[in-house]
Structures are given as structure tokens and as C-alpha cells.
Design a protein with these regions (language model features):
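Membrane-integrated ABC transporters
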Residues: 1-32, 36-203, 209, 213, ...
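Hydrophobic alpha-helical transmembrane bundles that constitute the permease/transmembrane domains
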Residues: 11, 23-31, 204-215, 267-270, ...
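ABC-type nucleotide-binding domain
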Residues: 15-16, 51, 65-67, 71-72, ...
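ABC transporter TMD-NBD coupling linker
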Residues: 39, 46, 344, 360, ...
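Short intracellular "coupling" helices and adjacent cytoplasmic loop segments at the cytosolic face
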Residues: 44-51, 58-65, 70, 138-146, ...
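An intracellular "coupling" helix at the cytosolic face of ABC transporter transmembrane type-1 domains
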Residues: 135, 146, 153, 245-246, ...
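Helix-loop-helix
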Residues: 287, 291-308, 312-314, 318-319, ...
């Protein structure tokens, strides 16, 4: 997958936006457990009172609290409270740090006031110890004590507070504040309801932000992934179009189709999910760990156990399943190849009654793919149940440990609830990555297969400084001691071929099957590069010209006619779309195609199906010839392109073609000597060597191979 990351450069801005939205979503997601904790701890247990800092308190209460404060604490309280008659009101503009200091000051003092209140055992014991009358207010007695004695009491209290859980100190302070509010006539229930309501509204706002962020990320991710798929398909197409025949033979057609469709789709789907899940999971997981450490560090070992178990499960499953993902894509290629062969070869299969054999062949390819798919899916079905078992086990363990912590006073119920939610978020982040891990290996294999195509070195490339042919020389072909061997082949297919064709000449190539006729003409458009020697067009080596400039000069008609889906008109215009309707008709007339075109209701607008399956072999060849004629090239190349024509049509076509191509060079590969008797030069090939060259008459006089071919096809009267 990493190898294809360069194709995301265009979407860098969108990716940054996605990451920003994911951070926003994670922040809101991680805030919800905190709000839940506060609703339970503060809203329910503390009646909506957040800390020990009262918004308002009586003057008498403040005087009692100040008994247990030092001078600095008294000064800080007086600076942040304003006296209104017999009450003190907290200022509105205090900072968070100041409030924390006040909370610490008030918490200790409130515990002391509660401890030495008139109805407390400790207060009554102190009154009795001091010999004061029964019913004396302990706090009044403390106020009359020397400051040193009070400080000594405070020191003893501080020692006890060190071992006391913070939650107990907080609860004591909050209870004191609630009692003070009730004494002042404030509605504590209203305070509680207001706190819960406002927290709920904030949670709803957070949920709305999460929803909007998730929708936005999904939308943008789909857009980025769609663009990636588009760019990959374009890149594969451009790369494949630049392939020479050597590279085409490296990849099967079925494999190239699979790579540009199924493999790209795999990468596109995973990329869309990766932005939503793979990027989000670590953000959520790391954020959850930070929140857990802030909540309570005594239970983090539970998360360590959970994460360790998850990693072990993932590792084991991947060791088993990963090799199969690679095999899976190969088997898909194989199934596509078999399907394509069967579908394109149905007439032959039926003719030889091989339906059962092909059915078995398809069944084997299908069964192999099914077995591998089942193996992978069976492995992955274990993953989610095991993960859920770990998740539920962690929940039980947290509740068990948390219950003990609550019982000991070291945690509040809300903190336990928050810890569970954070733990679930951390585990869920691993679950999300695990879910992606089912698709990632297969997508990674698909990405590697795509990259294999894109990284393939093209053997035939344009020169850095191309040479342009002279305008004075047109339609000239020269083979100069050309030898050629197919890549990785031991022997030459062509050896030391030399000839020259000038403008207006017709060159025919004849020979037995496998003698190298088609190979020879494939060197002219540079489908292959020669092994030795050179092929020149218009006086320039084809390797020194750009492929476009070279092929613009050629009108090529392959041995097997190839048509494209569209209309007859679009197929004839294929090489030169800008030609007029009159030129289209003229090309069809020369190719003897008007005979069947005019019989169709829609004439030139008649549809042609993919591969030209709705026209006969002869009609396909004539339309292919018309396409080459319409291009008006300097050089015509016919690779046994008249084989599907009857003698009458063949004769009429050659006669019209000779007149039309009198100013162009024509190269014809032929099987029948009768069709090339009038050629200016006939090249005779025998096992890759040039057995002879000349006119029909010259070859009959001095070329034994040509004589054998001629006598096998024509009678003595025809030869004479």
C-alpha cells in the first residue's frame, strides 16, 4: 500500500482536513465518558456542587472556617470574596488556579469545622477536656485558644489527611457546602437539576459534533479514495498502452483486466476505510490511554493485559491467514482466465463436444478459489468472538476492581464508569484495526500487483532526442541486415533480412507457416526492436523516431480483424476522426464494404458490438481495411488481411486498392500466390532466412522455395 501513497499527493489538503476532523471527533468521543462521570459524581452524589468553594456563605460560617486557616489562606479568601451584609459572595472573575487553591483551603477547614461542631463527639470531648460548661460551642472555645495550640491540632489533622482518600475529603467539603446553601435558603435540588441538565446539553452537543465530523470524514474519504482509484486506473491504462509486445506477454489479458478493476477496487475500498478507521483508531486509543491515566492509574494493568491478548490473537491469525491472501488474488486471476477462454471459445468447445471438460476445468478453478476463501473466512471468524470475549472480560475485571476501590473510598462510582468507557474505547480502537486487518492483507496484495504493472520497465521507449524524417522522402522502408529473436528465446526468428521498398511499390511477403512473415512486418511499427541491424522508415531508424510519429505514417491491418464497440462509422474513423462523411464512404467503397453496409437499415450508423461479434469474418476484415484506408497513411501493412474474403471480393478489393494506394507503399503478407503475382517485389522467407526476392517471374526462375509454393497452389497453365 505504501508504494501507492504517491498517488495521494493531489489530495494532501483533503487528507489534512480528514485528520483534523478525526482529532475533533476523537476529542468529543473521549469527552463523553468524562461528562458521564461528572453527572454521576457531581450531579447525583454531590447534588450538583462541584467542589468545596461555596458561591455564598454566612459571615459566622466564614469566621468558624478561618479558625483553621493561616494568615495567607485568610488573605486569599478575603481577596476573592465580597461581603454583602452578613454574607460573603464569591467574586465572578477568579481563575482556575485560584479556585483550586481555595478548594484546598476550604476542604481542610470544612472538615475541621464538621469535626469540632457542637453535636460531634470530638467537639464534646474537647469541651470536657478543657473543663468548660456543658453546651459550650467547641468552635467558640477553639477561637479563644492560643494560635500555637490551634496549629498543633491542624498539624495532627494534616497527618491524618495524608492517608485519607481525596474523594472522602471532597465529599466532606461538598456536604458542608450543601448544608450551608440550605441554611441560606438556596434550592439545592434546583442546583442539582441545573447541573445535570447543562451536562446533558453539552453531551448532546458533543454527539452532534461527532455525527457531523463522522459524516464529513466519510464523504471526504470517499472522494479521496475515488480520486485514487481514478488515478490508478488511468496510470495502469497509460502504462499498458506503452507496453511493447514483450510486456504484454509477461501479463495475461485476464490478469491485466483484474489488476485494473478488481485490484484497484480493493485498494480504493480499503483507502476509504483507512481514513475513517486506521487513522482514527490510534488517535482514539492514545487519547483513551491518556484519559485513563488521568482517571486512575491503579487499574491500567487491566488494559495492558487486554491489549497484550489482542496482539497475540492478531499475530497468530495473521501468521495463518496472510499467505492465503496472496494465493487468493492469483486464484482470482486464474478463474478470470479460464472464464475468458471458455466464453470466447464456446463455438470451438461445442464443435469438439468438450463441454464436460471445460466444465470440469472451470469447476476446479472455482473450487480452488472457494476453498481458499473459506479458509481465510474461517480464520477471520474466530477473530471477532475472541475480541468480544476479551472486551467483556475486561469489563467484568474493571467492575470488580473498581467496586473494591469505591468501597475503600479511593474512587468514585462515576470514575469507575468513565474508566470502563475509556477501556472500551481503547479496545474498540484495536477492534477497528483488527476489522481492517481482514481487508488490509488482500488490499496490500492488490496494491503490489498494481505496482508490479506500474513499475514494469518498458523495453521500447522513445528516444530522448528524436530524429524527424525528411519531407523529401516518404513511404520508404528499408531492412538493413536485420536479425531478430524473441525475448529469452535461444534462436533467431529472422536472420540477416535486407530489402528496400520505395514509395508507390507493393512488397509481398510469402513463406511457409512459421517462417517469420508476421514477425517481419511487426518490426516496421516497432512492436519489437530488432536484435541486430536496423529497420528504417523514410531514411530514419525506427528506434530514433517517436512511436507516435512512426505509427502515424502507417495503416496497419492485422491478420485477425479487430473492431471496437460503436458504429461502422466510428470504426472507419478510428485512425482519423476528423475525416468527412464522403471520405468515410470512399474508404468503405475501396474496401468493398458498401455491399453489406448499404443493406443495413442504419447504414454507417449501424451498431458494432464489442469485438465485432455481430459481423462476419469477411465483413470484419473489410471494415479493418476501410479503417486503414481512411487514415490515408504513407505505408499500408496488410498481415494476411484478405484470408476471409472470397475470390471475387478479393479481386475487386485488390484492384480498387491498387488504384487508391498508388502513391503509398504497400506491404502484404500473403498465403496465396495468385493474390501477389503483380507485386513489385516478393520476399520469400524460409525458416527465418530470406530465400529470395524479386518479381514473380524472377523468383520462378531462380528461387526453389518459391517454385515449390507456386506449384503447390497453381497449375502449370496458370504459372505460364
Amino acid at each position: 500500500m505504501i508504494k501507492l501513497m504517491k498517488y495521494l499527493k493531489k489530495s494532501a489538503g483533503y487528507i489534512v482536513l480528514i485528520i483534523a476532523l478525526l482529532f475533533l471527533q476523537a476529542y468529543c468521543d473521549l469527552s463523553l465518558p468524562d461528562y458521564t462521570s461528572k453527572i454521576i459524581n457531581v450531579g447525583i452524589q454531590q447534588k450538583g456542587i462541584e467542589d468545596s468553594v461555596p458561591d455564598k456563605l454566612r459571615d459566622s460560617t466564614l469566621q468558624n472556617l478561618q479558625i483553621f486557616m493561616d494568615e495567607d489562606q485568610k488573605k486569599e479568601v478575603s481577596q476573592n470574596y465580597t461581603q454583602e451584609e452578613d454574607t460573603w459572595v464569591l467574586n465572578d472573575d477568579i481563575s482556575k488556579e485560584t479556585r483550586e487553591n481555595l478548594n484546598e483551603d476550604f476542604s481542610k477547614a470544612m472538615m475541621m469545622v464538621s469535626a469540632f461542631s457542637e453535636d460531634s463527639e470530638q467537639g464534646q470531648a474537647m469541651v470536657a477536656q478543657m473543663g468548660l460548661p456543658e453546651g459550650t460551642d467547641p468552635l467558640t472555645a477553639l477561637a479563644q485558644m492560643p494560635e500555637e495550640a490551634v496549629q498543633q491540632i491542624m498539624s495532627q489533622v494534616d497527618e491524618k489527611l495524608k492517608d485519607m482518600p481525596e474523594s472522602i475529603v471532597t465529599q466532606a467539603g461538598v456536604s458542608f457546602v450543601a448544608s450551608e446553601y440550605e441554611a441560606l435558603g438556596k434550592d439545592v435540588d434546583a442546583i442539582q437539576m441545573h447541573y445535570i441538565l447543562m451536562s446533558g446539553i453539552r453531551m448532546l452537543a458533543m454527539a452532534l459534533v461527532i455525527m457531523l465530523a463522522a459524516i464529513s470524514v466519510t464523504f471526504i474519504s470517499a472522494r479521496v479514495a475515488g480520486r485514487l482509484g481514478h488515478d490508478l486506473r488511468n496510470s495502469i491504462y497509460r502504462k499498458v498502452m506503452s507496453f511493447s509486445s514483450r510486456e504484454y506477454h509477461k501479463f495475461s489479458t485476464a490478469s491485466l483486466i483484474t489488476r485494473s478493476t478488481n485490484d484497484v477496487q480493493q485498494v480504493q475500498q480499503v483507502m476509504a476505510m483507512m481514513f475513517r478507521i486506521v487513522l482514527y483508531a490510534p488517535i482514539l486509543g492514545i487519547g483513551g490511554v491518556i484519559k485513563v491515566l488521568n482517571t486512575d492509574s491503579s487499574m491500567t494493568w487491566i488494559l495492558g493485559v487486554a491489549v497484550g491478548l489482542i496482539l497475540i490473537v492478531i499475530f497468530v491469525l495473521f501468521q495463518v491467514a496472510m499467505p492465503k491472501f496472496t494465493i487468493l488474488q492469483t486464484l482470482i486471476d486464474r478463474l478470470n482466465l479460464v472464464s475468458r477462454e471458455i466464453l470466447t471459445g464456446i463455438p470451438v468447445i461445442r464443435a469438439f463436444s468438450r463441454e464436460k471438460h471445460e466444465e470440469d476445468r472451470f469447476e476446479k478453478a472455482n473450487l480452488d478459489l472457494t476453498k481458499t476463501n473459506l479458509f481465510v473466512n474461517r480464520c477471520m471468524t474466530f477473530m471477532m468472538p475472541i475480541m468480544m470475549l476479551i472486551m467483556n472480560g475486561v469489563s467484568v475485571l474493571i467492575i470488580y476492581s473498581g467496586a473494591h476501590a469505591v468501597d475503600n473510598g479511593t474512587m468514585q462510582v462515576g470514575n469507575v464508569m468513565a474508566f470502563i468507557q475509556y477501556a472500551m474505547q481503547i479496545i474498540m480502537s484495536f477492534l477497528m484495526i483488527t476489522a481492517m486487518s481482514i481487508m488490509l492483507p488482500r488490499a496490500n496484495v492488490a496494491a503490489l500487483r498494481i505496482d508490479e504493472v506500474l513499475k514494469t520497465e518498458v523495453s521500447i521507449q522513445d528516444p530522448e532526442t528524436p530524429v524527424h524524417p525528411s519531407e523529401s522522402v516518404k513511404g520508404e522502408i528499408e531492412f538493413d541486415h536485420v536479425s531478430f529473436a524473441y525475448p529469452e528465446a535461444g534462436e533467431n526468428v529472422l536472420t540477416d533480412i535486407s530489402f528496400k521498398a520505395k514509395k508507390g511499390q507493393t512488397i509481398a511477403v510469402i513463406g511457409s507457416t512459421g517462417s517469420g512473415k508476421s514477425t517481419l512486418i511487426n518490426l516496421i511499427p516497432r512492436y519489437y526492436d530488432v536484435t541486430k541491424g536496423s529497420v528504417k522508415v523514410d531514411g530514419v531508424d525506427v528506434r530514433d523516431m517517436t512511436q507516435k510519429e512512426l505509427r502515424d505514417k502507417l495503416g496497419y491491418v492485422p491478420q485477425k480483424g479487430v473492431l471496437f464497440s460503436g458504429t461502422i462509422d466510428s470504426n472507419i474513423r478510428y485512425g482519423k476522426p476528423e475525416i468527412t462523411d464522403a471520405q468515410v464512404k470512399e474508404a468503405a467503397e475501396v474496401a468493398q464494404a458498401t455491399e453489406f453496409i448499404d443493406t443495413k437499415p442504419e447504414k454507417y450508423k449501424s451498431p458494432v458490438s464489442q469485438g465485432g461479434t455481430n459481423v462476419s469474418g469477411g465483413q470484419k476484415q473489410r471494415l479493418s481495411i476501410a479503417r486503414a484506408i481512411a487514415k490515408e497513411p504513407e505505408i499500408f501493412i496488410f498481415d494476411d488481411s484478405f484470408s476471409a474474403l472470397d475470390f471475387k471480393t478479393d479481386s475487386q478489393l485488390r484492384k480498387a486498392l491498387k488504384e487508391y494506394t498508388k502513391d503509398a507503399t504497400t506491404v502484404i503478407v500473403a498465403q496465396r500466390i495468385s493474390t501477389i503475382l503483380g507485386a513489385d517485389q516478393i520476399i520469400v522467407l524460409d525458416d527465418g532466412h530470406m530465400a529470395g526476392i524479386g518479381t514473380h517471374k524472377e523468383l520462378m526462375a531462380n528461387c526453389e522455395v518459391y517454385q515449390q509454393i507456386a506449384r503447390s497452389q497453381l497449375s502449370e497453365e496458370e504459372l505460364a
